[in-house]
A protein has these predicted regions:
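N-terminal Rossmann-like FAD-binding beta1-loop-alpha1 element of flavoenzymes
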Residues: 3-30
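Conserved Rossmann-like nucleotide-cofactor binding loop
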Residues: 13, 36, 215
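Helix-loop-beta segment of a Rossmann-like dinucleotide-binding subdomain
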Residues: 91-104, 116-117, 123, 128-132, ...
Length: 231
């Protein structure tokens, strides 16, 4: 059977990709080598972030931030989607958007946060700069050693144990086939698309999406693609 798209990986990215494709009428098969939501998608804090990551900003500087900044508006749009995602998928994802706080211990830390905030605000992200008094009032549980920080009111979290299964159920309702315990062993190009050899047999599709997370490098190498670790 020839699918339109094979999605390799049954985590959050893979199941969400399958759902949105199928909702648009695309015939999709998901291949998961273990079970859904088993690896990183099901073992994280569920954080929904929009701010530019602080440590890479400090490490790589303004040039890196300018390249990354265009991602901020995309992240902000994704959080807007999360607000209504539970209703769309018919599940309680336990989304709570109560804001995210990045704190500074030193004046140097605070200067970096202020520089970073300029890039974030330029992309339309709401950032409130806090001094020590603001932190004491809004986050009294934070150590008194922290002298300030940046607060983004749109950040929050979702339940990582609920999100992927909800996407998978919605994907199935749209006709997606999900194959568990289907470890990918090789991928071959054909005149019609791709043959994906797995531990459960060969699956064919016109296109392949690599959503394999930590295994993405190995999957890409099957097609001669090197996923370099680029910051």
């Amino acid at each position: 059977m020839m699918a339109d798209v094979i999605v390799i990986g049954g985590g959050l990215a893979g199941c969400a990709t399958a759902y949105y494709l199928a909702a648009d009428g695309v015939d999709v098969t998901v291949l998961e080598r273990f079970d859904l939501n088993m690896l990183a998608s099901g073992s994280n804090a569920g954080s929904l972030h929009a701010q530019i990551p602080h440590d890479p900003f400090v490490r790589y500087g303004e040039g890196w931030a300018k390249n990354y900044a265009s991602t901020v508006s995309l992240l902000a749009k994704s959080i807007t989607m999360w607000r209504g995602l539970g209703d769309e998928l018919g599940a309680d994802l336990e989304v709570k958007l109560r804001g995210g706080l990045l704190v500074a211990r030193t004046a140097e830390d605070m200067r970096a946060i202020e520089r970073k905030a300029r890039h974030e605000r330029a992309q339309g992200l709401e950032i409130q700069l806090f001094d020590r008094a603001d932190i004491a009032r809004e986050a009294p549980y934070v150590s008194e050693d922290m002298i300030g920080g940046a607060f983004c009111p749109d950040e929050g979290k979702a339940n990582p144990f609920a999100a992927t299964p909800a996407f998978a159920r919605a994907a199935r309702r749209c006709g997606v086939r999900i194959e568990r315990q289907a470890a990918v062993l090789g991928i071959a190009r054909t005149s019609r698309g791709y043959d994906v050899a797995t531990s459960k047999g060969v699956f064919s599709a016109r296109r392949v999406v690599n959503a394999a997370g930590s295994d993405a490098g190995r999957i890409a190498a099957m097609l001669g693609v090197d996923l370099a670790d680029v910051q």
